[in-house]
Amino acid sequence: MMKSIYILFLLASQVIFAQYPKDYFRSPLDIPINLSGTFGELRPNHFHSGLDIRTNNVEGLPVYAAADGIIIRIKVSTFGYGKALYIAHPNGYTTVYGHLQKFSDKIEAYVKEQQYKQKSYEVELYPSTLKVTKGDVIALSGNSGGSGGPHLHFEFRDTATEKIINPMAFGMSKLIKDEMNPVISSLMVYPANDSTSVNKSKAPVSLSLQKQVDGTFLASKVYARGKIGFALNSYDLSTNSYNKNGIYKVATYINGSPNFKYEFDSFSFDESIHINYLIDFNRYKKLKQRFQKLFIKESYPLSLVSGNAKNGFLDIKSNVNYTFKIEVFDFHGNKTIVNVPISYDKELKLTSVSSKGNYYIKTKSDYNFEFEKTTVYIPVNAFYENVSLNISEKEGVLDIED
């Protein structure tokens, strides 16, 4: 039954994506499209909401309206997208153009008039009469706002809901040459709780990967007892770009049955904060390594994720051998596969792990701790999962560590 539901979900996803117009929009640039950032890419505290298109390390390239429409928003800022344009199109979608150097003469004149009126360089404007035609030059590419180098940020949204949609779904994928498979640089296996062991450890264990004759990868064998989950560090490459960009989709299987999946097709802005639960945030905080978890301990509202009843976890039992398969895709269908052999650990000799905190916080409860000079209040759902914290006070200074 679960397999049928999973297949139906995949078919529904394909039907929804097929509904997006593939030839309605043109490229915003007249140069070969190479990417320095992909849709859904993992960024600090958010998912990347569009494509970052390389402009060959220069500014001043003509930026074109992707289709007929009306400019509904103009923003000038010293951070974020810098100088940005938002064009609503009659088919219900909005395109966004960010990090611009300069607007076209007509738009620039309107913006300057409003800046003088407001006596401010930074403005956010909502015009209703600035119409554009497909192929009009609307701006010059730049490096404004929070940009790390010259490029164009190009984005698609549903005009009515503001939901962000992968630009590849609108035909952008046809403009990008990509014959390279994603790369899985690291793979880790995690004990889910204190009663679980992985390779005789209660701490996460790194697995080695060996490439096989058929192009797939075989991970080192896992001996486990109890519930376990996996996480990977991965990136995508394209044919004409050296950037390590974000991957599009991950799907996992246990002995052939669907286990867990996430796919960067679309998401809403208020979902973006959940990136810190999709990744191993503690590892990122300490080592600056982004490992994407292939499991969830507590349900949370992230539409990108789908899984089975165990939320991606594997319950390793005696007298059963398991093969855990991971498939990592880019939008062009290039795929990397890792197979992980797993057996039940009959001999349990555990290595020591670091001590737990002095307070155990459950995500579905609230807490109030009073010290001599300070008070700590932790509301319900302050954490994505149960956590042990060391909380102490010294000379009126509160110290909280996980």
Residue locations for each model-derived region?
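Short beta-strand elements
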Residues: S206-L207, N321-T323, F331-N358
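Proteolytic processing hotspots in large secreted/extracellular or virion-associated proteins
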Residues: K349-S352, K356-Y359, V387-D402
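Surface-exposed, short loops/turns at beta-strand junctions within beta-sandwich domains
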Residues: D315-N321
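Bacterial Sec-dependent N-terminal signal peptides
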Residues: M1-Y24
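Surface-exposed, glycine-biased beta-strand/turn segments
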Residues: A18-T95, Q101-K106, S120-S128, T133-K134, ...
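Surface-exposed loop/turn motifs at beta-strand-loop junctions within extracellular Ig-like
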Residues: A139, D158, D236, V328-H332
